[in-house]
Structures are given as C-alpha cells and as structure tokens.
Amino acid sequence: MFSASSLLAVIALAISSVSAAGPSAVPLGTAGNYVILASTGVSTVPQSVITGAVGVSPGTAASLTGFSLILSGTGTFSTSSQVTGQLTGADYGTPTPSILTTAIGDMGTAYINAATRSGPDFLEIYTGALGGTTLLPGLYKWTSSVGASADFTISGTSTDTWIFQIDGTLDVATGKQITLVGGAQAKNIIWVVAGAVNIEVGAKFEGTILAKTAVTFKTGSSLNGRILAQTSVALQSATIVEK
C-alpha cells in the first residue's frame, strides 16, 4: 500500500513524464539570434519598437531604412532609437558579413525544414479561415492562402509545439489578434509561409514567421516572436518583441 508521500511521488513522476504534444522543434540555428532577419531589406515608418537584433544580407546598410542609423566606432554594427539590439548589414566591418551569411543560410535551412514536414495532423482545416477557431498542437497544412477576419486562439501547454505550413499568403485583418491559452508560448509556434504575409492595422500576432517572400506589419500592429524573411520586411509603427 502506498504511503501519502509515495503516492505524491508517483503522481509527480507521471506528470513529469508526459510528452509535449506537436511536431519536433524547427532548429533556427544562428538565425535565432535575430528578431528580424531579411535578405533584401528592412524598413520602418517611425516610430516602431523592436526588441532584439535586426540583420540584412546580402542587403547593405542602405537597405535598413527609416531607422536613423548610428554607426558604431568599430564599424561592425549600427544602433537606432527604435531597436534595443544591434542592426547589421552585409557591408559592415569584419566579422559581420560572415556572421550574417551564416544566419541567412540557417534561415533558409529552417524554412526548408518546416515547409517540408510531411504527414500533417490537420489538412486544409477550416479552409484556411482561422477567425473564431481554436488551434491545438500539431502540424497544419494549407495548399492555399490563410486568413483571420476575427480573433482566434492557440491552445496548449508551455512545451507543446505548432507548425503552420501555408502555400499561399497569410493575412490578419485590422484589429484582430491571436490569444495564447493553457501556457502556450510564442517561441513554440512556427508559421512557414510561401506567399506574402500581411498583418493589418492594430492586429496582434504570435510566433516565428519563416517567410519565403515579404512580410508587412501595419500601423499599431504587433508581434511576439520573430520575422525571418527571404526577401523584405516592412514595419509601419509596429511593435516586434523577440520570443
């Protein structure tokens, strides 16, 4: 017969042994050192608020627009009143170019890893109309565009994971938001999008965006996560917080 202390120990072990739900994590490599990373450019319409580092390559400092860059004494990075971290481009001093080249390569590898996962748990669910839905942990696949014309929820624990594979565009309507419940964390959510990503005015988004093309966050919109884009990122007085 179990003593009270033994029973509690068994319960604790059972709880600790529960596996996280959802697909295995997508390795970001050194791309994970950036809150925004892009190939051709990053623009802002001031004032945006960005927590983390911003990088562009093979784009140069000239493709970091709207930031009022202040070049460091070493010439290896710049700063901006809109960004808590460093801003870097491919024409900065050594070793910045090689660091960025590696990060861009890691971004491409992460995109392929996420986009080519097979055997989705949810295929074409809600025909891509996410407004009003609740999304549980898992691998999701849409062969067309995805949008949210109303708020929606992502529900799971702090260790659960989500990968959303979208072959078309991703659009979130004005003022709509994602709510995380049950302990779900933005760092465990991956959106891998082949088409353009457009987050409208005042919308609130969660997760890492791995984008094949361009990403736009409009006035008053926000992101808890990262933007890793293989072309450009445009911010219009947006708030981007690294998660």
From Swiss-Prot:
Keyword Acyltransferase belongs to the record: no
Outcome after substituting N198Y: Has 40% thermal hysteresis (TH) activity of that of the wild-type
Domain of life of the organism encoding this protein: Eukaryota
Ice-binding (site feature) positions: N198
Entry keyword Hydrolase: no
Effect of S232A: Slight increase in thermal hysteresis (TH) activity (0.48 degrees Celsius) compared with that of the wild-type (0.32 degrees Celsius) at 0.14 mM
Key words of the record: Signal
Signal peptide positions (record): 1-20
InterPro entries (alphabetical): Ice-bd_prot
Gene induction: By low temperatures, 0 degrees Celsius.
Protein family: Belongs to the ice-binding protein family.
UniProt function note: Binds to the surface of ice crystals. Has low thermal hysteresis (TH) activity, which is the ability to lower the freezing point of an aqueous solution below its melting point. The TH activity of this protein is approximately 0.3 degrees Celsius at 11 mM.
Name assigned to this protein: Ice-binding protein K3-B1
Natural source organism: Typhula ishikariensis (Gray snow mold fungus)
